[in-house]
């Protein structure tokens, strides 16, 4: 462990040995009895809301959790010492599929399984010494919490942000439920890794797309977020500026226009003369209608059956072989007037743009591969000046070349050729050619400038039991009817035998009800909500967790929000963080809060890996539980090791040597503080101007390292903050070894001991509490003690090291007084290299104060 060269302090002092288990057990009991970490609600202090992403209680906590929570705990403790009124809560994201599957496996109820795990996790949290306000702790599976999730759902319904639709959805064959687009990661289910299928289902959605532009624009406000996370969200929202173009479906004769429009979205309207075919996705209803009762239907059905088994990401891969089916029908290009064949292709997705695509094989790799495979025309329409094909087609406005043989699509930026009146214009995104084509489309009412987003509405329906019930009732007479507010919460039945295959839909006691509108028999909706709806507003409930009238009061949220420091893994960059931002904006528009964004500063901590660099996971059996460190070394050792081993945002490999090193430092610092306390006098007046040389140097290190520790703490760089304290402990140890007890400055000894304890208190609080009370005689909890202040002037060294050069080359380095005159510097430098100056005449001396003396001889 770095900086372990702490000099050994004599063990002959009359002070107790460090006993981690006894000390930690003692103070955890005291903190519990005093309810020390209850939020004070002191409006005279500035507020600081520190929050770690709450865990899913699938079992006991692991070292990844420990790192996350230790970072937040250190922030919260230091903020309290810096004079802030701190809100530092914790809870559990308790609904979800793993608990349901585990309950089935163990033949028990999800609620029983979940609460058992929560009880164990809470014990582990408090054994690690985390300063959570236990009075604000809740679980999202508690009816007192999820009632308000249902309440918010109904408010969104009233605002027009909730709707039900039948559409192709991602179906996980393993988990037997649907997945939102965001939950398909790299073509697989985010939770189990299975490849989703496409199914047509009636599902409930939230209109997150209504906030797409604001979600994108407000990323600029998030200066305290990592740029990587902001970029990931911007990419997922995926704003594209382009145009919609209305192609007309030709009748079965392939020529006569019909009233049916096929609208495409493109960012490259300037390439419309290169469109040689139209593409529809296999899921398209129009495609199914076009091939109905035709010779192409069997091939279409086969393509559809295979396409829905492949993930969207894989279907769009540029290197994947393309598959298509001709529909036998044609569309009319609104600019050229020519007809182009309509094909169905598996690389086209229903949820991109309008769902229809114009195929431009000379400008797109996938279109090019498709055209080559099915022998479709490839029309060069954009060329870079100076190329052979440009020289051949320069100024040609009508089609001259409709089939070329090259390795791939041509340039996407260049001069338009074979493009009618637009020939000769420079093409590209936002180019003069693109502007001219869009102007033509708009003028002739066959197209328009528009913006599309990759983001799709949030599908929240889940076909599983262990989730927040959607508070809707279906009546054959009235349709879908919301559950009245005074009937919330809709609670889950606890008598299902999940192991036997029971489902909510089969539970008569749950399903059968009466319509709130007409009073006739009706049925409850049996879908539950995506668990991310529970975690998208929990940070607001912490502000007012016992409110029985509302999810939270506006006054409480005005006091605490936004969260000042939010800590969690980067794997939540899109799902949780995007959804939370959406909920915040909706609740703002409902008049419940005034903020635009929920999290001011975001820290995405790195992962904890095993000694081989592999990610820890239960399935691999390489998880290190906190107890494996706490039992032999203590919680403080674990906390120190976690914070010291690497910057918070970096991954690190778990190493027992780091733990052992952390424990050695704790014991050495323990001895140093006790040894200083032998001379320390809290009542003595400290005056740095009266200190002798050794005391003055220790005081300088105290202030220099104190300033560094404070600065690094404020930046969240705990490893370098700890290094600064280690240097101070080194200096204090040297002072103890070199200065007899009777010669030590009593006020300085107290100040150093006190400040070492204070600076380490957020990191190793049990150790600090014991020393504060027993060694320093304080009766105030360290959590309530002030963070020490340091003086930059006293941090300055009285001496500086300067280089001595002879003819520009460094020959020596000397320690001199910081305010030495040029004459004194010259004399000291000359003496330092006297042997090298023998027989030489000094012709010139150049002095740069504080840096060097250059002698020319």
What is each stretch, according to the model?
Residues 1-45, 281-284, 294-298, 377-388, ...:
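Basic, alpha-helical terminal appendages of large translation-related enzymes
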Residues 2-8, 12, 17, 25-26, ...:
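Residue patterns forming the tRNA-binding/recognition surfaces of aminoacyl-tRNA synthetases
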Residues 40-108, 138-152, 266-267, 334-370, ...:
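N-terminal catalytic cores of NTP/NDP-binding nucleotidyl/phosphoryl-transfer enzymes
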Residues 72, 85, 287-385, 390, ...:
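Catalytic alpha/beta core of large soluble enzyme barrels
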Residues 209-239, 281, 285-325, 488-514, ...:
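Amphipathic alpha-helical
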């Amino acid at each position: 462990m770095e900086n372990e060269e702490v000099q050994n302090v004599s063990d002959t002092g009359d002070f107790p040995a460090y006993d981690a288990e006894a000390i930690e057990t003692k103070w955890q009991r005291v903190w519990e009895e005093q309810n020390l970490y209850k939020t004070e609600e002191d409006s005279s202090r500035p507020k600081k809301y520190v929050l770690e992403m709450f865990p899913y209680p699938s079992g006991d906590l692991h070292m990844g959790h420990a790192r996350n929570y230790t970072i937040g705990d250190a922030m919260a403790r230091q903020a309290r010492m810096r004079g802030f009124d701190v809100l530092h809560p914790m809870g559990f994201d308790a609904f979800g599929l793993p608990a349901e599957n585990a309950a089935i496996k163990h033949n028990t109820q999800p609620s029983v399984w979940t609460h058992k795990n929560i009880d164990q996790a809470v014990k582990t949290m408090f054994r690690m010494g985390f300063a959570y306000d236990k009075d604000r702790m809740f679980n999202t599976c508690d009816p007192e919490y999820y009632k308000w999730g249902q309440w918010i759902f109904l408010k969104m319904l009233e605002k027009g942000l909730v709707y039900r639709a039948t559409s192709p959805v991602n179906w996980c064959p393993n988990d037997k439920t649907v997945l939102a687009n965001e939950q398909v990661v790299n073509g697989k289910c985010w939770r189990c890794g299975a490849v989703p299928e496409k199914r047509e289902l009636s599902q409930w959605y939230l209109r997150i797309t209504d906030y797409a532009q604001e979600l994108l624009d407000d990323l600029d406000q998030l200066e305290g977020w990592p740029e990587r996370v902001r970029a990931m969200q911007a990419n997922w929202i995926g704003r594209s500026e382009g145009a919609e173009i209305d192609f007309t479906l030709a009748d079965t004769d392939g020529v006569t226009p019909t009233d049916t429009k096929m609208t495409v979205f493109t960012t490259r309207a300037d390439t419309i003369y290169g469109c040689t075919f139209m593409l529809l996705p296999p899921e398209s209803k129009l495609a199914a209608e076009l091939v109905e009762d035709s010779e192409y239907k069997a091939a279409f059905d086969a393509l559809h059956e295979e396409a829905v088994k492949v993930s969207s990401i894989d279907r769009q891969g540029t290197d994947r072989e393309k598959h298509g089916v001709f529909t036998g029908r044609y569309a009319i290009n609104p600019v050229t007037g020519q007809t182009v064949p309509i094909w169905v292709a598996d690389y086209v997705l229903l949820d991109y743009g309008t769902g229809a695509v114009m195929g431009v094989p000379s400008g797109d790799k996938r279109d090019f591969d498709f055209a080559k495979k099915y022998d479709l025309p490839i029309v060069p329409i954009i060329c870079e000046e100076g190329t052979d094909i440009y020289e051949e087609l320069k100024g040609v406005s009508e089609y001259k070349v409709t089939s070329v043989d090259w390795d791939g699509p041509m340039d996407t930026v260049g001069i338009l050729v074979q493009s009618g009146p637009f020939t000769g214009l420079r093409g590209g995104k936002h180019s003069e050619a693109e502007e001219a084509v869009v102007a033509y489309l708009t003028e002739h009412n066959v197209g328009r400038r528009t913006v599309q987003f990759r983001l799709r509405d949030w599908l929240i329906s889940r076909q599983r039991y262990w989730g927040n019930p959607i508070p809707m009732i279906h009546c054959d007479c009235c349709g879908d009817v919301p559950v009245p507010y005074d009937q919330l919460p809709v609670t889950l039945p606890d008598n299902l035998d999940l192991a036997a295959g029971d489902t909510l839909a089969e539970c008569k006691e749950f399903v059968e009800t009466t319509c709130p509108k007409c009073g006739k028999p009706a049925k409850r909706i049996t879908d539950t909500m995506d668990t991310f709806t529970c975690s998208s507003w929990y940070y607001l409930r912490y502000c007012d967790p016992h409110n029985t009238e509302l999810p939270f009061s506006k006054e409480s949220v005005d006091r605490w929000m936004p969260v000042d420091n939010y800590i969690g893994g980067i794997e939540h960059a899109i799902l949780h963080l995007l959804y939370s931002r959406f909920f915040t904006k909706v609740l703002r528009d409902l008049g419940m809060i005034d903020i635009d964004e929920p999290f001011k500063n975001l820290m995405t901590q790195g992962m904890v890996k095993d000694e081989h660099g592999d990610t820890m996971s239960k399935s691999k059996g390489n998880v290190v539980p906190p107890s494996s460190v706490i039992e032999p070394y203590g919680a403080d050792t674990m906390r120190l090791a976690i914070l010291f081993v690497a910057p918070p945002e970096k991954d690190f490999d778990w190493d027992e040597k780091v733990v052992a090193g952390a424990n050695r430092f704790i014991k050495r610092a323990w001895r140093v503080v006790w040894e200083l306390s032998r001379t320390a006098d809290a009542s003595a007046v400290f005056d740095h101007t009266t200190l002798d040389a050794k005391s003055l140097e220790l005081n300088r290190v105290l202030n220099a390292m104190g300033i560094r520790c404070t600065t690094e703490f404020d930046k969240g760089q705990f490893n370098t903050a700890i290094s600064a304290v280690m240097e101070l402990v080194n200096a204090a140890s040297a002072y103890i070894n070199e200065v007899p007890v009777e010669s030590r400055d009593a006020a300085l000894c107290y100040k150093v001991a006190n400040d070492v304890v204070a600076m380490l208190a957020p990191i190793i609080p049990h150790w600090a509490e014991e020393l504060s009370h027993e060694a320093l005689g304080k009766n105030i909890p360290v959590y309530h003690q002030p963070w020490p202040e340091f003086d930059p002037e006293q941090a300055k060294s009285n001496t500086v090291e300067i280089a001595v050069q002879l003819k520009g080359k460094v020959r020596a380095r000397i320690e001199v007084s910081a305010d030495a005159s040029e004459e004194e510097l010259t004399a000291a430098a000359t003496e330092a290299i006297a042997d090298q100056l023998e027989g030489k005449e000094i012709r010139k001396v150049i002095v740069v104060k504080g840096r060097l003396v250059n002698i020319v001889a």
